C-alpha cells in the first residue's frame, strides 16, 4: 500500500477532505502501526483509549492524532523491547520507504512507584523525491495506568478505501463511558485546555454517554491527584474565555471534514453550545461528588 497515494485518492474522492491530506496520511499510518503491533502480539496486554480510539473503534467524525494505550499499574515495558525493531521492519518492507522509530529509555520506566509513560515516535519519509518536505510522524504512548473497563472490538473503516484486512484486527479498548471520564480528567489536569477534549466531550454527550462521578474520582486517584475536582472546577471557569479566544476553531479545522466544519464551528451559537454542554456535564460531576462527601463525617 502506498500511503501517500492512498491518502491523495481518499481526499480526491471526498472533496470535504480538501487540505487534510497530511492528517489522512497519519490516520493510515495508525492502521499500519496497529497491524504491526497485532501481528507480533504487542496489543494483548494493552487497552486502547483516547480520541484516536473514539475514531478508530467507535467511528468519531474527528480525525485523529496520536495512539494512546494503558497497560495497568504493574505493566512491564520489557515485554515491548522488540517493538521498535518490529515496527521498523514491517513499515520499511511494506512501503519500501525510509523509516525511523525512536523508543523510550527503558531504565527510566522501571520505577513502579510513579506513573510511567513510554513514548515511541515513528517517522516515515512518504515523499522521498521531495527531500525538503518533513517526514510523516506518529506518536505511540503507553501509560502505567489502569483501564477500569475493557471491551474487545474490531477496527472500523474510517474511509471506504481503507483495506478490508484492517477491520479484522481486534483490540481491547475502553468503553465510551470510561473515555468520557478520561476526557474530564484530562480537562482538569492538562497544562492547558485542549480543543480536542472539548470536542470529544460534546460528541460523547450527543451519543447519550453518561459520565460517572465515582469513576472520575477513581481516575483522579489513579493519577495520585487529591484535588482533581477542584482543578476541574477551575477549568470549567476558564472554558468560556478559552472558547472566545478563537484557538478552539483554529485547532479543530485540522481535524474536521469541511462539511462538519460548516455544520459546527461555522454556525452561529455553536461555541456557546459547546461551552454550555461541557460546563453542564462538569457541574453535574462536581455536584455528584460533593453530595457523596458530607461536610461533617460522623
Regions found by a protein language model. Give the residues of each.
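Structured mid-to-C-terminal alpha-helical surface segments
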Residues: 1-46, 57-60, 72-298
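Glycine-rich beta-strand-to-loop/alpha-helix junction loops that act as flexible
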Residues: 49-52
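Anion-coordinating catalytic cores for phosphoryl-, nucleotidyl-, and glycosidic chemistry
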Residues: 64
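Structural signature of FAD isoalloxazine-binding scaffolds in flavoprotein oxidoreductases
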Residues: 69
